[in-house]
């Protein structure tokens, strides 16, 4: 694939990178053909690469940069903290301040345990659910991504009633034998699996909006159904809000959809561009973590003062007005995608919620992972490359989502819509 854009320096760096970094990248999704562009700097809603190209960014580091890149308030706060130290190994007051802010926002949050990533957060939440219930089995949904740890890195498409098979070499089948897979938005499948595993299921973990398979929305009443059936059967409900937390609303998907889970995990936006994650939930469960309880969870950089400082400064800016503005931007782009697809007679389905959106090149509605997989991924990549050539960067995968930030202004949206029109016309 030859791109009609100057990327000589990025090509050189990629060839060099492959000598030292596996595949030339540190996370697989960053790799795309013929090679990824290498970023030199970022500001507001723009990425600037090593060849001097400017890209309007709708990937936003896969979600965290909701205030835009290099936000001055965050940078100033972090610089001040760095003068005071970057890691302590003992508590600091700022951990309390951020915990209070999380508790004030997230409906289920009565206590918090800070960790270093979304992966650590979901891993800890599942361990906590198993520990407090004394049960081993968990339910996850096909296509849902809850981090790269063994219990949830499970092959999808195995059917609602079969035990999961590992999705990666290096994971023993015994590790995932207690992971039950179910299609998203399928109430009957949930009922059946719970019925056939009575009193054995510790938790259901889900992304309230499936953001790691594009943007699959919960059907009306589905989250309420999950809340009711888990309560009826003594199963903990875990909302993985690593993507939706602080993005759909101040209180994330729980506030947006009016559903209160037992536990929730957050990350991404919480760190304002720095590594962080958090497990939150009801006090009766959270206090079972050590040192109060017997369920072990620990980390050298848990509650890191730099990440916590960035988190405090980020959440200060996320009020109701902010969400109205970022949602409006995503609505404009989503509507334009629908109109442009119709204009050029392209089969496409566009889904959006708050400041998250994605287009699937598909004739049918996308409500499950299997629906998403049936989309025309080759067409999506042609769409991606044309956008890139016209100065717009979205995640290089049909199975990721796009985000708006507060920095995507009217001029930026106009340029984006022009690029979308060119890309759709070329399809």
From Swiss-Prot:
Pathway: Porphyrin-containing compound metabolism; protoporphyrin-IX biosynthesis; 5-aminolevulinate from L-glutamyl-tRNA(Glu): step 2/2. The modification N6-(pyridoxal phosphate)lysine is found at residue 268. Keywords: Cytoplasm, Isomerase, Porphyrin biosynthesis, Pyridoxal phosphate. Its EC number is 5.4.3.8. The keyword Isomerase applies. CDD domains: OAT_like (cd00610). InterPro entries: 4pyrrol_synth_GluAld_NH2Trfase (IPR004639), Aminotrans_3 (IPR005814), Aminotrans_3_PPA_site (IPR049704), PyrdxlP-dep_Trfase (IPR015424), PyrdxlP-dep_Trfase_major (IPR015421), PyrdxlP-dep_Trfase_small (IPR015422). One of its GO terms (biological process) is protoporphyrinogen IX biosynthetic process. It is found in: Cytoplasm. GO terms for cellular component: cytoplasm. GO terms for molecular function: glutamate-1-semialdehyde 2,1-aminomutase activity; pyridoxal phosphate binding; transaminase activity. Its cofactor is pyridoxal 5'-phosphate. It catalyses: (S)-4-amino-5-oxopentanoate = 5-aminolevulinate. The keyword Cytoplasm applies. PROSITE patterns: AA_TRANSFER_CLASS_3. It comes from the Archaea. Disulfide bonds: none annotated. Belongs to the class-III pyridoxal-phosphate-dependent aminotransferase family. HemL subfamily. This is Glutamate-1-semialdehyde 2,1-aminomutase.
